[in-house]
Regions:
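Non-transmembrane, aqueous-exposed alpha-helical and coiled segments at domain scale
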Residues: 162-176
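Conserved beta-ketoacyl condensing-enzyme motif
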Residues: 55-61
């Protein structure tokens, strides 16, 4: 019925917001902002109605969660970097019906997921920064998915991504884009050295790993990448333990995915972290290579409906 039209992996560095403001950082992230705007325009051209963002700044300790409130509006200051993002206004319509559908299909496929359509919870800046540049006119509806998963299996995140695609393609009357909002390596500069590393990667080792991953992506080496993802997420300091990336690749077919990534904003350093904007073309997949769920099959597992 519905269509998953686009699947980007995007940066959300808070220095993008600083780049708008008068001061020494003004204009310094224009390439990343332009990349967001280009991806947003592609979504418009493709008829996308809803952006689903896998947000590595939404930390959760149990289950997966979907923020699908009917409307988001407020003023945001980052608790992590309040000197970077302060008093940033935001507003976007939500899509409660799609959010509930996504959760239902994920649960049916063995990945415990809760939809929150009646909540005071606002999105985090992994969602809000991209929306600032892709959705300033509230053209798109927005859903945020928790992707800073503290006690979760990457295989379950991959399964979640595939389940969300099935929900869209099998049951939704509309067109959707999935976004993995997070960096590659995410080792922040040591306190006191942030200015020195404002435009650099923390270590040659991490930069080498990131660049090798990008080479694999551009050559569609998805089988080897999926195999190494858990170790890369750990040793490479992947943002959010790379759960956003696992979700995106799960939606794309996991190790069976067969298209090269397109770099929109080339790899760049930000406060020691490795960033980019890239688009992963959506190709036909049957999900045969997506890992089965793990948590819901564990001995002693009880569903959240019983625990609460």
């Amino acid at each position: 019925m519905g269509t998953l039209e686009l699947a980007p992996k995007i940066t959300h560095v808070p220095s993008m917001y600083l780049s708008e403001l008068p001061g020494p950082r003004q204009g310094s992230r224009q390439d990343a902002i332009d990349g967001h705007r280009l991806i947003g325009q592609r979504c418009r051209d493709m008829g996308v109605d809803t952006l689903v963002v896998f947000d590595t700044h939404w930390l959760v300790n149990a289950s997966y969660h979907i923020n699908c409130a009917p409307h988001f509006k407020g003023t945001y200051t980052s608790n992590e970097l309040p000197h970077f993002i302060a008093n940033m206004s935001f507003e976007s319509p939500g899509n409660p019906a799609l959010g509930r559908l996504l959760a239902q299909v994920a649960n049916d496929m063995g990945v415990e997921t809760l939809a929150h359509d009646n909540t005071s919870l606002h999105p985090e800046y992994g969602t809000l920064v991209p929306l600032r540049y892709m959705n300033p006119d509230q053209h798109f509806k927005v859903i945020s998915v928790s992707a800073m998963c503290m006690a979760h299996y990457l295989n379950d995140s991959a399964r979640l991504g595939w389940a969300l695609r099935r929900a869209v393609e099998d049951h939704y009357d509309g067109t959707v884009a999935f976004f993995a909002s997070g960096s590659l390596s995410h080792r922040f500069a040591q306190n006191g050295l942030a200015p020195e590393f404002g435009f650099k990667i923390w270590s040659p080792y991490l930069e080498h790993m990131d660049r090798e991953v990008l080479r694999m992506w551009q050559n569609a080496e998805w089988g080897p990448f999926c195999e190494m993802l858990p170790e890369y997420a750990s040793k490479g300091h992947g943002e959010g333990f790379m759960h956003d990336t696992a979700m995106l690749l799960g939606a794309l077919g996991w190790s069976a995915y067969d298209a090269p990534a397109e770099m929109v904003t080339p790899y760049f350093g930000a406060s020691g972290t490795g960033q980019l904007n890239a688009v992963f073309p959506v190709t036909p997949q049957d999900g045969a290579h997506v890992p089965p769920p793990i948590a819901s099959s564990a001995q002693g597992y009880t569903p959240v409906s019983v625990r609460l």
